[in-house]
A protein has these predicted regions:
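C-terminal motif of bacterial Sec signal peptides marking the signal peptidase cleavage site
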Residues: 20-22
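Sec-dependent N-terminal signal peptides
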Residues: 11-14, 18
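Beta-rich carbohydrate-recognition and catalytic domains
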Residues: 24-80, 84-142, 150-264, 273-336, ...
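Bacterial N-terminal signal peptides that target proteins for export
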Residues: 2-10
Length: 370
């Protein structure tokens, strides 16, 4: 029950202050300072407008083992990168599309490296791509998309990625000792969920001496995934994953919210970061055309943050009410898919946080938290 306030002088003062504040000019910001209810969040991120976008499509070629001919594998678009710090450098593993085939673009994973986290040099060929292997049935000819990346305790790297066969997207994963050579392990979900539409696997990890390392909670590794609601899976070894269920179905741990920036869908961003406050998950979202947030564009992809219980990973503790990043630059509002900021790569480098994101499914940009 709310306590009644009888001191009309105080009421008048409060009302007057509110009027003064309400009459101040409104500004639109990409990020906001933490408030008492969002002090757990990783904020603020500022877009580096002076150099964005930092990665663009190019003319690099490689010999496609399936087509058996040379293709310009990144000439259409580059977007949605994972990021990792290795040997004092930042590596981006990014999605790239050619202009070939019935989907007018097969996706592959390329790699670029930077000394400062801002200026990148691409490698000539992709490092992960559809091949004549046992996973071709899942990966061809839509391709391999949207990587997420963390290190493992035994000095390897695990990448989750999406395969697309033209009908169903599936969440797959691969391991590498050096970021250049990858061994595919197949689908994350198996059994009755093997052919379920699944995407965007964000493994829970901690920061250790500048590296982001997959970490166990209650004796298990954990992963958030999904692109409608968010769901979870756990693993003893990072290889064999078991979905978290409720009443025999995938348990939803984060849902869209009517009338808000994340009204249509929610989708994992980078890895989920274990902090002193809990498990911090930066996530992507889409605004409904009708019934969403009227202050942002219809169908816009914006970024939010949520906090989960460090001892009970499916338990949601806090969630930002407003997005902290939205499309407002020309290269974010216009492209292959308009109105998109899609966050996917995060590193702690040179005492700053670098957040890498796809813009309009066409290019790559960066925002920095000091």
């Amino acid at each position: 029950m709310k306590q009644k306030i009888y001191d009309y002088t105080i009421v008048a003062l409060i009302f007057g202050c509110a009027l003064i504040i309400g009459c101040q000019p409104k500004t639109t910001q990409q990020s906001h300072e933490p408030t008492p209810d969002s002090s757990w969040a990783l904020l603020p991120f500022v877009k580096v407008d002076s150099i964005n976008p930092i990665l663009n499509p190019g003319d690099n070629e490689f010999e496609c083992p399936i087509l058996k001919r040379t293709v310009k594998w990144e000439e259409k678009d580059v977007f949605n990168p994972a990021a990792v710090v290795k040997d004092g450098k930042v590596y981006l593993l990014y999605r790239a599309e050619d202009k070939v085939g019935k989907y007018a673009g097969t996706s592959r994973i390329g790699i670029a490296v930077s000394e400062d986290g801002l200026h990148f040099t691409k490698m000539q060929e992709p490092v992960l791509y559809p091949d004549n292997d046992s996973l071709k049935i899942f990966e061809w000819e839509g391709g391999i998309e949207d990587p997420r990346l963390v290190a493992t305790e035994d000095k390897q790297y695990i990448m989750t990625y999406t395969s697309y066969d033209g009908t169903t997207a599936r969440l797959l994963f691969a391991l590498s000792p050096d970021l250049m050579h990858w061994t595919k392990y197949g689908t994350v979900l198996n059994g009755k969920y093997k052919n379920t539409w699944s995407k965007s696997g964000a493994i829970v990890a901690r920061e250790t001496n500048g590296s982001i390392v997959a970490t166990k909670i209650n004796g298990k590794y954990w992963m958030y995934f999904g692109d409608t609601d968010l769901f979870m899976a756990s693993s003893d070894d990072l290889i064999h994953w078991n979905p978290v269920e409720e009443d025999g179905k995938l348990k939803s741990v984060l849902r869209p919210r009517a009338g808000q920036f994340d009204s249509r869908l929610v989708e994992s961003g980078p890895f989920a970061l274990l902090t002193d406050n809990g498990i911090l998950l930066i996530y992507n979202s889409m605004n409904l055309d009708e019934g969403g947030d009227p202050s942002i564009a219809k169908g816009a992809y914006c970024a939010g943050q949520a906090l989960f219980d460090a001892n009970d990973p499916p338990k949601l503790v806090h969630r930002l009410e407003k997005n902290f990043m939205m499309p407002d630059k020309p290269y974010e509002t216009t492209g292959q898919v308009n109105q998109v900021c899609f966050v996917e790569g995060l590193v702690h480098f040179n005492d700053k946080w670098f957040l890498y994101y796809g813009t309009a499914d066409s290019k790559i940009a960066v925002a920095v938290k000091e």
